[in-house]
């Protein structure tokens, strides 16, 4: 009985999705800055993770 309101809300959300007239974004539509930001974030994470490889856990700070 508790699932019924959740089910109704989900049905309403599905019904309110955009129609086919709206073009869907593809990976080609993404701005190049987001790719550079993702690469920079990955490199920063790997540089922070590198200190863990030397068993110095005190310097490992996960974002």
From Swiss-Prot:
Disulfide topology: none
Superkingdom classification of source: Eukaryota
Sample GO molecular function, one term: toxin activity
Changes after translation: Contains 2 disulfide bonds that can be either 'C1-C3, C2-C4' or 'C1-C4, C2-C3', since these disulfide connectivities have been observed for conotoxins with cysteine framework V (for examples, see AC P0DQQ7 and AC P81755).
Tissues expressing this chain: Expressed by the venom duct.
Pfam families: Chi-conotoxin
Keywords: Cleavage on pair of basic residues, Disulfide bond, Neurotoxin, Pyrrolidone carboxylic acid, Secreted, Signal, Toxin
Annotated positions of the Pyrrolidone carboxylic acid modification: 50
First and last residue of the signal peptide: 1-19
Localization per record: Secreted
GO CC terms, sorted: extracellular region
InterPro entries (UniProt xref): T-conotoxin
Cleaved propeptide residues: 20-47
The record's note on its domains: The cysteine framework is V (CC-CC).
Family stated for the protein in its record: Belongs to the conotoxin T superfamily.
Protein name: Conotoxin TxMRCL-D012
Annotated organism of origin: Conus textile
Lineage of the species this protein comes from: Eukaryota, Metazoa, Spiralia, Lophotrochozoa, Mollusca
């Amino acid at each position: 009985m508790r699932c019924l309101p959740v089910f109704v809300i989900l049905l309403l959300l599905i019904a309110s999705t955009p129609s086919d007239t709206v073009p869907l974004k593809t990976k080609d539509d993404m701005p190049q800055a987001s790719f550079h930001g993702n690469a920079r974030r990955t490199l920063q994470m790997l540089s922070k993770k590198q200190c863990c490889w030397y068993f110095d856990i005190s310097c490992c700070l996960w974002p």
